[in-house]
Structure formats: C-alpha cells, structure tokens
C-alpha cells in the first residue's frame, strides 16, 4: 500500500534536501520519490545526507512537469504555508495521513512539496484536492523541506499501522477519477464555456479557478464525472445543429 504514495518535490534547488527527504521517507516506509524539474541533479552530497536511503534517490522518478508526476493519482495533496486569495479544502498532517492511506488501497496518492523559498504556485495548488497546512508555532513556523516531509511521512506511517490493526468490514469500493481524468474534464468544460460565450478564451478570469474549487470540494465519483462529460458532449452536439 505505501508504495502507492508518492512524495513529490517541485524544482528542488539543493541536493542535500533530496538526500534528507529520502531519509525521512524511508524511516517511515515510503520509497516512491518524484522530482519535478529539479534545478540540480542528485549527487554525492544527496547520497551522504540520505544516510542509507540512497536506494530511494537512485530509484527516484525525474519528470519535467507536475502533470506528469500526478498522472494516475486518485488523490493529490499540496503543501501550503501561505494564505491564498482563493480558499481551498484544507487538511492537517493527521488527516492527510488518514486520507492518503485510505486512498492508497485503490490508487496512487501524491503529496506535493514546493520550492524551498517560495513553495507551490497558485496554478500548481489548483491541481490538488486538498491543501496541507502544518500547524506550527505562529511566532516561529520555520520548517525546512525535509522536516515537513518527515512530519507528513510520520502521520502516514501512523495511519497505516492503525489501519493494519483494524478488522474492517468490506464495503462497496467507489472509484474516483484520477488527476489526469479531472484535467481532461476541466479542459472539456473550459472549451464548452468558451464556445458558448460564457467565458472569454483569452481571459477566463476567476471563473475556471472557482469551478476547479467547486469540483475539488465535491470530489465527484468516476461515474458522476462521466455523466458531467456526457452533458458537456450533449451541449456541444446541440450547439452544432
């Protein structure tokens, strides 16, 4: 199950953070590291700071875009230390661990960590189902990247162990769309809204952002998403008559 959980680092600028992150992950049983467009490549310094977790670095998946790192994921959680102009569903580390372990039984999960200095962009955060905030001391909330990964990895580990100890009744499994399914839906929706004149192609403004937030909050099941796509296709056919 834990192998289905991806720790994703976006545009990391220090190899030491890669090594320390690998160490934090492996101590909690996580091994699936993704590096999105890293500004430096893993080196001997990263290996040294991994302290025996060099295999995590050696098997890390390096991609050039966040979309590629999120492909196939059914749940995406992005870390955010800053308040944003557009509110989003929030979780703290404990809930993040519980949701991640629950979803990892059925599909891949992504926990996304941003750049060391500026974190994730608003556009990147809009690709996430939830934003993760670590409730640190308001007078001194300075966490480095590896510390944040360690805290989240610990909560994932605790949720995993708790789930292993429980004998749960089997319920009907619900299939949720993957991140790439949702991106295709948003593209389809934006095309229909453009063609209908509801939004302007060059200036979609906040409408698409708010629609993303709406559907992220609702988190439609796969069958429900197919219905929505069918409605959009029906509107397109009607408009061509």
Swiss-Prot record:
GO terms for cellular component: cytosol. CDD domains: SpoU-like_TrmJ. Keywords: Cytoplasm, Methyltransferase, S-adenosyl-L-methionine, Transferase, tRNA processing. Its main location: cytoplasm. S-adenosyl-L-methionine binds at residues 79-81, 114, 134, 141-143. Homodimer. It is found in: Cytoplasm. The gene is trmJ. Its EC number is 2.1.1.200. Catalyzes the formation of 2'O-methylated cytidine (Cm32) or 2'O-methylated uridine (Um32) at position 32 in tRNA. GO terms for molecular function: RNA binding; tRNA (cytidine(32)/uridine(32)-2'-O)-methyltransferase activity. This is tRNA (cytidine/uridine-2'-O-)-methyltransferase TrmJ. It catalyses: cytidine(32) in tRNA + S-adenosyl-L-methionine = 2'-O-methylcytidine(32) in tRNA + S-adenosyl-L-homocysteine + H(+); uridine(32) in tRNA + S-adenosyl-L-methionine = 2'-O-methyluridine(32) in tRNA + S-adenosyl-L-homocysteine + H(+). Belongs to the class IV-like SAM-binding methyltransferase superfamily. RNA methyltransferase TrmH family. GO terms for biological process: tRNA nucleoside ribose methylation. The keyword Methyltransferase applies. It comes from Photorhabdus laumondii subsp. laumondii (strain DSM 15139 / CIP 105565 / TT01).
């Amino acid at each position: 199950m834990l192998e289905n959980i991806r720790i994703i680092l976006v545009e990391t600028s220090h190899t030491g953070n890669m090594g320390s992150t690998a160490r934090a992950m492996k101590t909690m049983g996580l091994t699936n590291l993704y590096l999105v467009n890293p500004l430096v490549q893993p080196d001997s310094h990263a290996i040294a700071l991994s302290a025996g977790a060099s295999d995590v670095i050696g098997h890390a998946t390096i991609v050039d875009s966040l979309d590629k790192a999120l492909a196939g994921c059914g749940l995406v959680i992005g870390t955010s230390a800053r308040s944003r102009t557009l509110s989003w569903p929030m979780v703290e580390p404990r809930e993040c661990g519980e949701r991640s372990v629950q979803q990892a039984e059925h599909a891949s999960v992504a926990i996304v960590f941003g750049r060391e200095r500026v974190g994730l962009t608003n556009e990147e955060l809009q690709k996430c189902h939830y934003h993760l905030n670590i409730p640190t001391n308001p007078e001194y909330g300075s966490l480095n990247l590896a510390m944040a990964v360690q805290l989240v990895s610990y909560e994932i580990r605790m949720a995993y162990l708790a789930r292993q100890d429980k004998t749960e009744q089997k319920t009907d499994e619900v299939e949720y769309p993957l991140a790439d399914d949702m991106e295709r839906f948003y593209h389809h929706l934006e095309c229909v809204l453009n063609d209908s004149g509801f939004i302007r192609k060059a200036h979609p403004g906040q409408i698409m952002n708010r629609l993303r937030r709406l559907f992220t909050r609702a988190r439609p099941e796969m069958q429900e998403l197919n219905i929505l796509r069918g409605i959009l296709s029906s509107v397109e056919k009607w408009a061509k008559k």
